[in-house]
């Protein structure tokens, strides 16, 4: 995320936790305040700050379907202590009702990757862990195949024929 300012800012004392992404420029819209772990890097002219979100923040934003899903659902509000000008003056806060729309938007084009899975044959449950949130509504259990070792010549496998999927609140785990 790149934030542009009307004058040079002092990025050494920037507070990422004063930044909130919003789905609309109205009070009561879906929003997400950056929790921390984000890194801010000051760049030259024009006066900009580059914000690299912590993975936990990026995943949390992706997990809110109506937030930052397109340019039409991506707005930003800032607290006055987000950053100061080089003269020490605080920036003008941008309230939730006056949130600024994104000027350039790049959609997430990276598909989630399965990291690990566990299976419990006593409870008939399988837990799959992904590297980013998944949309349980688009998850198709019938597209899941469990196979034996790749080195096995017979290539034994079983394709699932049903079951219901439940996703964890952070979107990173799916239980069948």
Residue ranges of predicted features:
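Non-catalytic beta-sheet/beta-sandwich ligand-binding modules that flank or precede catalytic cores
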Residues: 1-176
